């Protein structure tokens, strides 16, 4: 499901930005921000996967003759950046700002990501500058403008299920130990 979410983000940008802002449909890709990705115009990087902790704890349920365990709810955090090193038409600062504005409009208008049969809330992350610097430093890159998005809750299905024996009928026989009287 995680890869499906990432591919859907990528497809949304391609559908909205090509051909007006992208040279070709391969201009948006899932990749880490690095100088060697010169064919990428816009990069989408999943930088964090964490537990979605806002919901109440869910327990296994019985479905027929098996116990089904609940999915794990996760939060996916993305960094979306305009590649300053893009080959064949790298962006000047003005073009870069226009592209960021277009992407902000796309994600603001979208607000919910349709992935398979799920509607997943999509929101911008208001991140402190120190946190942004930390992310970029961990990638060995200087800080640059980027959009930070969160998709949550994303259900990751449990592979665990157990066979249960369900008691459907009980025969109860009792014998009285008292003889006579009360």
PLM region descriptions:
Residues 67-71, 105, 165-182:
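Short, cationic low-complexity segments
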Residues 98, 104-156:
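Acidic-leaning, charged glycine-interspersed low-complexity segments
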Residues 58-63, 90-101, 118-119:
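"Short basic amphipathic alpha-helical interaction patches in structured regions
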Residues 2, 6, 71, 92-100:
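Short, charged, low-complexity patches
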Residues 59-64, 94-95, 161-173:
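Short intrinsically disordered coil segments
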Residues 1-60:
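Small/polar-rich, solvent-exposed N-terminal microdomains that initiate assembly or binding
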Residues 70-85, 101, 143-153:
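Oligomerization/assembly interface segments of phage tail-like spikes and tubes
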Residues 8, 12, 16, 152-154, ...:
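A short, solvent-exposed, low-complexity linear motif enriched for acidic/polar residues
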């Amino acid at each position: 499901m995680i890869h499906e979410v990432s591919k859907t983000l990528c497809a949304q940008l391609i559908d909205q930005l090509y051909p007006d802002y992208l040279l070709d449909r391969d201009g948006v890709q899932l990749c880490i921000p690095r100088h060697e990705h010169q064919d990428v115009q816009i990069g989408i990087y999943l930088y964090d996967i964490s537990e979605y902790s806002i919901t109440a704890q869910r327990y296994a349920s019985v479905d027929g003759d098996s116990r089904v365990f609940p999915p794990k709810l996760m939060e996916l955090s993305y960094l979306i950046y305009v590649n300053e090193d893009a080959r064949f038409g790298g962006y000047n600062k003005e073009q870069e700002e226009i592209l960021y504005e277009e992407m902000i409009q796309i994600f603001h208008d979208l607000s919910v990501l349709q992935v398979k049969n799920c509607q997943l809330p999509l929101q911008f992350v208001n991140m402190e500058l120190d946190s942004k610097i930390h992310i970029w430093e961990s990638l060995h890159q200087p800080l640059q403008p980027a959009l930070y998005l969160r998709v949550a809750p994303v259900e990751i299905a449990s592979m665990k299920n157990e066979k249960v024996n369900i008691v459907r009928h009980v025969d109860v026989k009792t014998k009285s130990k008292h003889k006579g009287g009360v």
